[in-house]
């Protein structure tokens, strides 16, 4: 398999984004991310609903990225051999739990020539297992039909790659991974060498944002709404005297806790009674400041402890304006080289999965995908 100029298909279905991307080496051929809006009315992501949405949307997105990359060619020979029939029967077994996807697959795939895809990089975890399985089974079905190898990718490694790809980083480095399901400090002694040195003991930071947004009566997803309100008053603060705790700020270790901060917001909101728009803005601003202060303090501590001068930040919460600016200021003042995902690639996407697959191919570190399974609780340092 080509190592440097491979065409790689990336597939990401770990939560509520259905995402596919095609790359040729470091060149992006196509990249589409579809966010499932159906969850907004429920204030959170329902795994089985996410699974159904992935199954409905994967094939149409796949068609689109093939067309965008000019890789969709009508098949020349339409003669169905016994071998072809056996392959399609195997596909039927792979996708038996996704009948809508199976129907779309059998209608479209036999009508096109095999595209020159060298490998399929797909998220194996962590994430919602029903959602992960749809992407994995789609990858397995394509691999079965076209005899293409699968590269299992850790979703959190994808977030690191989205910040680092195409750049030169010095090791040791520290990665701060902040998302709806994770708040982790990861020590990297080299590429693919990960050690989790700090993590949340309860709520992840993105989860805390969503829960506080719910307390304030804001729509889902809560992170952007909290940020919007906070930014509207940050410069003036409206004379607010609100003060929320900075959990585990001086705990002496590298761990986090955001459950108590969320509870403090709940008690404050109950004490204040009916919240005005200004109240909501001031609470959002103080909450965001508290989170940011803790994240910066813990990261500063781990960088000093391991004498690291490189900081990598990835995950959906890294799109937050206040958090980004705080870390940019911190890095500039402390001679730290900062790598942070662009806002467009901070949230879940398939481009980071494809690039992670490419990096593993180049380094001969690609894991076998023959026995790939969905692993909802997969750790970044787990090489199963």
Residue ranges of model-derived segments:
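Short Gly/Thr/Asp-enriched flexible loops that form oxyanion-binding sites at enzyme active sites
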Residues: 122-146, 321-330
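Conserved phosphate-binding/catalytic loops in two-lobed NTP-binding clefts
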Residues: 152-153, 311, 327-353
């Amino acid at each position: 398999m080509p190592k440097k100029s491979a065409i790689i298909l990336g597939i990401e279905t770990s939560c509520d984004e259905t995402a596919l991307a095609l790359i040729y080496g470091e060149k992006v051929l196509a990249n589409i991310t579809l966010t499932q809006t159906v969850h907004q009315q429920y204030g959170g992501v329902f795994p089985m609903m996410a699974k159904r949405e992935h199954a409905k949307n994967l094939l149409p997105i796949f068609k689109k990225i093939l067309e965008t990359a000019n890789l969709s060619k009508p098949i020349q020979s339409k003669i169905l051999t016994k071998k072809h029939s056996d392959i399609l029967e195997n596909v039927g077994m792979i996708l038996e739990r996704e009948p809508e996807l199976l129907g779309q697959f059998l209608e479209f795939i036999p009508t096109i020539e095999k595209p020159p895809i060298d490998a399929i990089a797909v998220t194996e975890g962590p994430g919602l297992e029903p959602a992960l399985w749809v992407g994995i089974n789609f990858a397995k079905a394509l691999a079965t039909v076209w005899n293409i190898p699968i590269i299992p990718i850790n979703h959190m490694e994808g977030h690191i790659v989205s910040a680092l790809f195409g750049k030169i980083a010095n090791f040791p480095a520290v990665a701060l991974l902040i998302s709806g399901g994770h708040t982790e400090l990861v020590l990297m002694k080299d590429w693919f060498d990960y050690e989790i040195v700090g993590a949340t003991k309860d709520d992840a930071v993105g989860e805390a944002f969503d829960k506080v947004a719910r307390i304030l009566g804001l729509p889902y997803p809560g992170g952007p709404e909290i940020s919007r309100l906070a930014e509207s008053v940050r410069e003036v603060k409206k004379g607010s005297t609100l003060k929320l705790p900075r959990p585990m700020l001086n705990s002496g270790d590298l761990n986090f806790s955001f459950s108590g901060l969320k509870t403090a917001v709940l008690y404050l909101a109950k004490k204040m009674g009916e919240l005005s728009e200004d109240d909501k803005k001031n609470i959002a601003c103080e909450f965001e400041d508290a989170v940011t202060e803790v994240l910066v303090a813990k990261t500063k501590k781990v960088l000093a402890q391991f004498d690291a001068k490189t900081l990598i930040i990835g995950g959906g919460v890294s799109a937050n304006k206040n958090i980004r600016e705080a870390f940019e200021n911190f890095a500039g003042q402390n001679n730290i080289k900062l790598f942070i995902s662009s806002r467009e690639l901070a949230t879940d996407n398939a481009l980071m999965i494809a690039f992670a697959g490419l990096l593993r191919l180049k380094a001969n570190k690609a894991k076998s995908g023959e026995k790939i399974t969905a692993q909802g609780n997969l750790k970044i340092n787990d090489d199963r």
